[in-house]
């Protein structure tokens, strides 16, 4: 074959047309509704829910079944919570597939302890650490976002292109932070940059002044913070600013969230914060998603929103292609519907896709966040976007070459 908040989410988890009696097909959603990415999760969930809405409004799955999307809170930082949430979806909710998780550690825990043993395909829209690629997953774990091996290289080259040739780095001590820091430092130093100090820090602490003191002792004014904007990342930046230690703050996707702006403030970040995040290239699929998201009143600009829509829509296409709500066969069907050649399907074009699949015509989904040609590890290529804070808002400064 070819290749917002937890309560709101739970209350809205059944997306079905009222009064319909068809059986439901369950696709679960695992996200960090509480914890260090609690402001990042709702827009991703909303985008996935929008994809489910499009499927349900245009005939549903298979013989008219509606998709139901039960949720699970991984907390992002607690492997036990992630495992338990995934176990409930796999063994109690009996989902056919899972969107998520979002944080890398949560995805790995959920996969190893529930999804892989249960034969359930997971598609993460946000787990970026290289460690996901190394899972012994029986071809069950995919992602619609590029690996941090890609983003770390792009961030390093972005700084060097700006003439920032010496930095200090602090990263959150988990799979996400370590993977991103390793990729960044390796490329930055290999291409002529100097990392004067590189320190891990633990998440969810109230005080990082000791680490900041060590970093500032180098005399380097440019601080790279590879962490979460809802927890350690915002505290590190705020305390660095209060002490006058640094003049430039640099981050990655975990920092490009509303919690950083809300809790640190534009007076600190305006014209002094730059970052990278996975971006959505200018394609017919991404343009279509902007229209659909705006019509639905959700943010198309939120980090990982496009990837969340694609994870949900791709899983629906795979189930339709597979011809049943059984778990077996979803993975090869996912590879089939996501890759060329085939009749192009854009976001929202469920009715068209359903008719083509029924006719035995090959399809190729071109998504909200770009093309998703999964490699042998379930990874996708992608683009990285430069971000900055201007007038109290995150703004895109364009796409970066790797």
PLM feature segments, named:
Residues 17-23:
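Sec/Tat signal peptide C-region and signal peptidase I cleavage site
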